[in-house]
């Protein structure tokens, strides 16, 4: 697909004179365009759901979720991956973000990195990609060689693959087994795909990782019951989670958390089933870490 024919490279009539308007009007134009992004994502919800189910199946069998992208797309993958361990208590490395150009590229532009097909393949080889893993290629344009080559290599290994782009019929979409293509239209600043396209990608990644964690028992109701308390704010959040899940008071919640080394799931089962920490942990282990299943046990 030629660059000039891509939707993400088109000219947006709504912002054609954005350099001549007031600051407030400038913000309104950008905001009006941003409002269209959730609707574009809504149109591809079935594709997102299908990807979540595949990701969950593979991760449940011992695989990993691997994000692969360049520039903004790569940074968004790293952002999503880095939030999973503290939010959901998963081991670092279960969700991985790879960016063309390596760690330096997180904060700096690396010339030619996104054009390196070899880079996409080598980065996957360096993390010992296996057929059990899922590779999610992220590229607003859908034409990034680094991502396309990575997806091709992943499919050769037998991996399940997902392609996220904002141009229908792109190479990323056709290379991946599952295509997620929120079409957000031309950007306010022509070709600046960090804007609407980047926002759409972030919304999709939010759903992929959150959906995986919900289906993996990391959420009870709408509570992040595997959160790791790495600071005072999260210590307080743990107490509130146990309170909200059980109806107990703050003192009871804190006592249960202390008794089980600050594991929210265990504390919740302790309170609701009147068990000690060891009994509650055993009960959870017997039910794959799912609180709801543990509570249904006679």
From Swiss-Prot:
Record field: catalytic activity: N-acetyl-D-muramate 6-phosphate + H2O = N-acetyl-D-glucosamine 6-phosphate + (R)-lactate
EC number assigned by the record: 4.2.1.126
Alphabetized UniProt keyword annotations: Carbohydrate metabolism, Lyase
MF terms in GO: carbohydrate derivative binding; carbon-oxygen lyase activity; ether hydrolase activity
Domain SIS: start-end pairs: 55-218
Membrane-crossing segments per the record: none
Pathway membership, UniProt: Amino-sugar metabolism; 1,6-anhydro-N-acetylmuramate degradation; Amino-sugar metabolism; N-acetylmuramate degradation; Cell wall biogenesis; peptidoglycan recycling
Record-annotated active site: 83 (proton donor), 114
Enzyme class: lyase
Entries under SUPFAM superfamilies matching the protein: SIS domain (SSF53697)
GO biological process: 1,6-anhydro-N-acetyl-beta-muramic acid catabolic process; amino sugar catabolic process; N-acetylmuramic acid catabolic process; peptidoglycan turnover
Superkingdom, natural source: Bacteria
UniProt key word Lyase: yes
Induction pattern: Induced by MurNAc 6-phosphate that releases the repressor MurR from the DNA. Repressed by MurR in the absence of MurNAc 6-phosphate.
The keyword Protein biosynthesis is annotated on this UniProt entry: no
Subunit structure, interactors included: Homodimer.
PANTHER family assigned: GLUCOKINASE REGULATORY PROTEIN
Family: Belongs to the GCKR-like family. MurNAc-6-P etherase subfamily.
Name of the protein described by the UniProt record: N-acetylmuramic acid 6-phosphate etherase
High-level lineage: Bacteria, Pseudomonadati, Pseudomonadota, Gammaproteobacteria, Enterobacterales
């Amino acid at each position: 697909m030629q660059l000039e024919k891509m939707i993400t490279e088109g000219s947006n009539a709504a912002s054609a004179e954005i350099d001549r308007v007031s600051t407030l009007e400038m913000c309104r134009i950008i905001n009006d365009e941003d409002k269209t992004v959730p609707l574009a994502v809504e149109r591809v919800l079935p594709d997102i759901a299908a990807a979540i189910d595949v990701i969950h199946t593979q991760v449940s069998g011992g695989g990993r979720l691997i994000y692969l992208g360049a520039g903004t797309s790569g940074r968004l993958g790293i952002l999503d991956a880095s939030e999973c361990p503290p939010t959901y208590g998963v081991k670092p490395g279960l969700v991985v973000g790879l960016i063309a150009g390596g760690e330096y590229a997180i904060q700096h532009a690396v010339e030619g990195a996104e054009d390196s097909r070899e880079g996409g393949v080598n980065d996957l080889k360096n993390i010992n990609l296996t057929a059990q893993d899922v590779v999610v290629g992220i590229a607003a344009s859908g034409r990034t060689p680094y991502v396309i080559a990575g997806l091709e290599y992943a499919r050769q290994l037998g991996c399940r693959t997902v392609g996220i782009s904002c141009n229908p019929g792109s190479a990323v979409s056709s290379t991946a087994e599952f295509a997620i293509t929120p079409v957000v239209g031309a950007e306010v600043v022509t070709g600046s795909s960090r804007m609407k396209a980047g926002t759409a990608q972030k919304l999709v990644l939010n759903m992929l990782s959150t959906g995986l964690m919900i289906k993996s028992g990391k959420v009870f109701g709408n509570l992040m019951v595997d959160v790791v308390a790495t600071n005072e704010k999260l210590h307080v959040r743990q107490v509130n989670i146990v309170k909200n899940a059980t109806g107990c008071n703050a003192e009871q919640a804190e006592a249960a958390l202390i008794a089980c080394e600050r594991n929210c799931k265990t504390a919740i089962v302790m309170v609701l089933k009147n068990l000690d920490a060891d009994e509650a942990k055993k009960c959870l282990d017997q039910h794959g870490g799912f609180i709801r299943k543990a509570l249904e046990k006679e």
